[in-house]
Amino acid sequence: MKREEAEVAVVGGGVIGASLAYGLVNRNPSVLLIDKENMELTASRGNFGLVWVQGKGFGMPRYADWSIEATEHWPEFASRLEEESGISLDYEKTGGLEICLGTQEFEERKNFLGQMQEQSKDGTYPCEMLSRSDLQSKLPDIVLGDEVSGASYCPHDGFVNPLALLKALHW
């Protein structure tokens, strides 16, 4: 093991640790990323790659705001990381749906989003409820099951290839 010196050490080379190190190295070139040798069995390799706002930060308004702000920075971040690493992240900001089954689940989701809106600093929250017919209009090629009552939709939601992201952060 060779000894390294740095002003900042980040322990953990998964998506979170590697992202922190990536951000820090742009401010301070003396950053050391410490991780185990085998990256095969990590949570970062098994995640879904969701860049998601919906439902994050309930009871924690600042976290909810950060989630929204973070998704607003994703296109620029993904573009810059792809350019620097030469690795396509397959990032897409498609918007996201949370499907509701039955009237009760639809009403619970609607109330939840209302609470998220109430806790926000400006009284807004970037998600909306879609009726079953509105949802069907968004998904014209999909036959909705009888229990589907609608969905919540957030235009900020999207996804990234988590394996490509991890590889690009480690380039």
Regions found by a protein language model. Name each.
Residues 1-5:
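A short, basic/flexible loop-to-alpha-helix module at the beginning of a structural domain
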Residues 37-39, 135, 169:
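Short beta-to-alpha linker loops that shape the active-site pocket of alpha/beta-hydrolase fold enzymes
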Residues 49-138:
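Dinucleotide-binding Rossmann-like beta1-alpha1 core, especially the glycine-rich loop
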Residues 6-33:
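N-terminal Rossmann-like FAD-binding beta1-loop-alpha1 element of flavoenzymes
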Residues 23, 76, 111, 168-171:
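Alpha-helical scaffold segments in soluble metabolic enzymes
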